Amino acid sequence: VSSIQERLYPTLPCFGCGHANERGLRLRSHEGDDGVVTATFTPWPEHDNGLGFLNGGIIGTLLDCHSAAAVMLEADKRGWAALGGAALPYVTAGLDVRYLRPAPLTEPVELRATVAAAAEPEITAAVELWWDGKVRARADALWKRWRPRA
């Protein structure tokens, strides 16, 4: 089964979720039967924060890019396509991240995202990073309609 990223934006070069970026994280998110968008990510040794845990910047990227999957899926369902030849219909306008506990460097982590509110001008999503039955980090993501200027 192809991921949301592979279906909706397969040529995107984004570091976190772009499958066209060979050196990126290439996150693969899927919609569950309950409407929750999920993904599993296995960190690389290079993602070390210096203390043997997953780096906060990588966590932020994962939360941002996983929220993107939930937002782009919602936009697709509502027919809110990209405008003016843009690669995506929405762009990150805000990401309020909270780090709650260390996340492992050597084991897969789970990402969960839901759309909290959706209107064409902006969509908000709640996203969490889980490991060992506990939330390790969470974020509220604000996405704004991308309107390219000529």
Ranges and model annotations:
Residues 22, 34, 55, 66, ...:
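Short connector loops at helix/strand junctions that flank enzyme active sites
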Residues 38-65, 69-74:
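A conserved, well-ordered hydrophobic junction motif at loop->secondary-structure transitions
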Residues 1-50:
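Non-catalytic linker/capping segments at the edges of enzyme domains
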Residues 41-43, 99, 145:
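Hydrophobic residues in beta-strands and at strand termini
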Residues 1-11, 103-110, 114-150:
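HotDog/MaoC-like acyl-thioester-processing domains
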Residues 61, 65, 95-98, 127-131, ...:
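Hydrophobic alpha-helical segments of small multi-pass membrane proteins
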